[in-house]
Amino acid sequence: FCGLFSSILWIGLPIVFFRLIFLNIDSFNGWDYYQILFLVGSYTIVDGVMMGLLIRSMGILESDILSGNLDQILLRPFDTQLFYIFRSFNLVQFVNTFFGLAIIFISYGNLNVHLNSLKILFYILSLMCGCIIYYSIWFLITISSFWFPTKFSKVDVFLNYIGISKYPYNIFTGINRLITMLFVPNLLIANPAVLIFLGKDTLNLFFYQIVFTVFLIIISR
């Protein structure tokens, strides 16, 4: 029950935050309230799936790195990364995915968006890339324990870092946006999918997301 309550609180806070902002303005850098709500919902879908898979597994991986138990795992005849991805689930976190779906359906009902099968396909593919980016960032932060062991958990580092993913990427402008995309790639988790869905982007950011996804796959292997 406590986990479910914290999930509702975690999802509800940004919704309330944006609602308060839009009490005084009609749009924010070209985004209205329901468009941002759609972004929050889309990110929550990715977050629910990946947190359900990884919130325990990444902690176990970090512990195995620090204790030396990883050496024994590496000698086993299976893919080590897949082993850790599916090693332990958190079912409460998976519930967030359904909250995310509810949010996007509610927001979609208030959006003037023309849908077609190609747009839906690109949206789904982009969210899948977002899942890979989400995992890769968390994995790379976790394995940094090889070189930079700390007294605090790398899980906390990741959770503090990933929160910005639910915000529109174009709150940054000019050179700041370029720097942000290079050094804060978590903004690529949900933004490209939502921009495609809303018709705000001509697939440019989506193609950049694909390239960056391939790059992360290579370096995380």
Language-model features: locations:
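Hydrophobic transmembrane alpha-helices and immediately adjacent juxtamembrane helices
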Residues: 1-221
